[in-house]
């Protein structure tokens, strides 16, 4: 295990990508980065992270925001339950802990929306606690290298993966404590970054002297470990994720030049393209949305309604909607009970129909058709009539955002 760790952490120091959240151990910033990066590829998530930190630089700012403001900043990331949990957790941290994050894994795990992965990331990076993280990148790396051939979405395989990670983390903890106590483990030529790349640009700062973004020095966790010590639990976790994300990739990894090619089970037995093994994926559920883009003759704006039911996109705004169990033509839609419930004898004019647009979620496929309609008089039953200049302030799902991008709000 020591040889594995030496190779991994040496590789990380020389190859880690430089991201803003790798330059801090502030638990608020680490928490934000972990939640956001779970939604998207890290390169795509960095702009969201930067924007979020700019608008909500401290946990107090996030807690004091409205849910709509949070959802608007989250727009485009999907899975909006996480954004709502983020907001709720910020309020919990402010109200219950005075704005300071709990400093142990168990209390972090009790926070709303904070699972094993996020709690382990905060505990290890910010507080040096030996809790391994397990995401898709880590699972892929571990199953290939150590030869775990059970389906990874089953409990038995997850337990086996965590046992390997726990053993690795135990070794990290021992090496960290020894090196911190004796100061014998210093960077060697093999541990130094590539030429021209400063060490601090690729590793989290483990010794902080500045105040946190909130301006409160007390909010910065104590970190007395020397920044050059590679055997830090947080660095181990980040190295595992980084290697899986950039080297032990899902398809066509460069095994010939991999630093673990002599010890990798999957490479030895020709299973690189087969691991990690997964059981049959759940079939996608198809849903058919018919959006009614309603305006009022002689008035600027279109109607929006807020989704309040316990379904996808809760808390976001959308056009009035009719959902059907299968694709339907416009004549059939006009004769449906749902259409009559919406409009009854309300005079209206159908201006246009936009062809079906698709949007994939984790277990659902949304097929949406948009109908531009004009009614004679305003009606509260369709929601709120939003002026074009204010539409951009509403948090909306990506499928609505795409429609608005295609059809300029000034024309609506």
How should each PLM-predicted stretch be described?
Residues 4-7, 11-202, 211-253, 263, ...:
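Catalytic cores of DNA base-excision repair glycosylases
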Residues 1-17, 23, 174-180, 188-204, ...:
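Intrinsically disordered, low-complexity, charged terminal extensions of DNA damage-control enzymes
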Residues 206-208:
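Ser/Thr/Pro-rich, intrinsically disordered low-complexity segments
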């Amino acid at each position: 295990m020591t040889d594995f760790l030496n190779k991994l952490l040496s590789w990380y120091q020389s190859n880690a990508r430089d991201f803003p959240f790798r330059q801090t151990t502030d638990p608020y910033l680490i928490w934000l980065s972990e939640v956001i990066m779970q939604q998207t590829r890290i390169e795509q998530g960095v702009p969201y992270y930067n924007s979020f930190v700019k608008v909500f630089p401290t946990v107090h700012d996030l807690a004091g925001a409205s849910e709509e403001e949070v959802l608007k900043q989250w727009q485009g990331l999907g899975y909006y339950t996480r954004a709502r949990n983020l907001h709720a957790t910020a309020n919990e941290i402010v109200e219950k802990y005075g704005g300071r994050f709990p400093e142990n894994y168990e209390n972090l795990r009790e926070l709303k929306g904070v699972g094993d992965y996020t709690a382990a990331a905060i505990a290890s990076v910010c507080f040096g606690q030996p809790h391994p993280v397990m995401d898709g990148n880590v699972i892929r790396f571990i199953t290939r290298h150590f030869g775990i051939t059970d389906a990874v979405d089953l409990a038995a395989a997850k337990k086996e993966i965590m046992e390997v990670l726990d053993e690795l983390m135990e070794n990290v903890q021992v090496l960290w404590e020894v090196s911190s106590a004796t100061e014998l483990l210093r960077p060697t030529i093999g541990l130094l970054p590539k030429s021209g790349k400063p060490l601090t640009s690729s590793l989290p700062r483990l010794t902080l002297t500045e105040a946190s973004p909130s301006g409160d020095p007390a909010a910065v966790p104590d970190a007395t470990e020397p920044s050059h010590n590679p055997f830090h639990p947080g660095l181990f976790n980040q190295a595992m994720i980084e290697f899986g994300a950039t080297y032990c990739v899902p398809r066509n990894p460069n095994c010939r030049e991999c630093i673990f090619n002599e010890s990798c089970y999957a490479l030895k037995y020709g299973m690189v393209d087969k691991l990690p093994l997964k059981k049959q994926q759940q079939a996608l559920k198809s849903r058919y949305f018919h959006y009614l883009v309603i305006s009022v003759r002689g008035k600027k704006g279109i109607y929006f309604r807020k989704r309040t039911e316990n379904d996808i996109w809760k808390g976001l705004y959308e056009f009035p909607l009719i959902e059907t169990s299968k694709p339907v033509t416009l004549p059939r839609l006009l004769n449906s009970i749902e259409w009559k419930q919406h409009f009854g004898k309300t005079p209206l004019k159908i201006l246009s129909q936009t062809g079906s647009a698709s949007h994939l979620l984790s277990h659902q496929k949304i097929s949406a058709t948009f109908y531009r309609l004009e009614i004679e008089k305003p009606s509260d039953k369709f929601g709120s009539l939003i002026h074009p200049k204010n539409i951009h302030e509403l948090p909306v799902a990506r499928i609505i955002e795409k429609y608005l991008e295609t059809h300029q709000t000034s024309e609506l």
